[in-house]
Amino acid sequence: MPTLQSGPVSLHYQTRGAGPPLLLLAPGGLRASRAETWARAPWNPIEALSDRHFVVAMDQRNTGTSFAPITSEDGWASYAADQLAVMDDLGIEQFGVVGMCIGGAFILELVTEAPERINAAVLMQPVGQVANRDEFRAIFDEWRSDIGADHPEASERDWEGCWTNLFGSDNLLWSVPDARLPTIETPMLVLQGDDVYHPKEASQQLAAAAPKATLIEQWKDPADQPAARAAVDRFLATYAS
């Protein structure tokens, strides 16, 4: 697995296939957004798309084998900078993005802060805020407990600053203000979520607000997967080729 080293930050990623490039942003929240997590997802884009795309799957900072110091300035922009740095390391200027769970929040940060880099985005059950901040706090605290021993540099202020920057807002989709959703011009395919961390309201309101977004409501059950995968294939062939 290649490693991008930038000062104290090390980012590990893997590549497979050939064709138009796609960056894959894995599910699993802060604790598990790493390349290998895709193997446990209802649909694994590494396997499904690498026959016709050059796919890049990365371990986000402080998951898997990637590392970065914890600071009070950490937030969605920190992750976006990492993701763009990986694509820069590969010499890729423009690319599509496929993300699941927290990957949806990562994508929305990318398409608002670097829209010229992203030609298409698939968001599978994006995380959202609908009366569930306590549940996200519990996930954050578990992540901190898991990695805290590896971060003697981090003070309580650093951890709380990181929490606030990520999950302290009232944004429906966490990473971007609701008012910015109608300004997103990137073509997006949204596969609806349906649980406490991925509320369907978040998917529905994103698809309604963003002018070039399309919603797929049913996709996870085995009976629905062939049609949903075909829709993803058509979408990527149209916009990420």
Question: What function would you assign to each model-found segment?
Answer:
Residues 196-202:
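Conserved alpha/beta-hydrolase "acid-adjacent" motif
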Residues 78-95:
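Conserved acidic catalytic loop of the alpha/beta-hydrolase fold
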Residues 59-63, 127, 219-221:
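Short beta-to-alpha linker loops that shape the active-site pocket of alpha/beta-hydrolase fold enzymes
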Residues 93-129:
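Conserved hydrolase catalytic core segment
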Residues 6-67:
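Conserved HGGG/HGGXW glycine-rich cap/lid loop of the alpha/beta-hydrolase fold
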Residues 152-179, 195:
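Hydrophobic, aromatic-rich cap/lid helix
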Residues 213-241:
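Catalytic active-site module of serine/aspartate enzymes centered on a nucleophile-bearing elbow/loop
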Residues 183-184, 190-192:
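Short beta-strand/loop motif that positions the catalytic acidic residue
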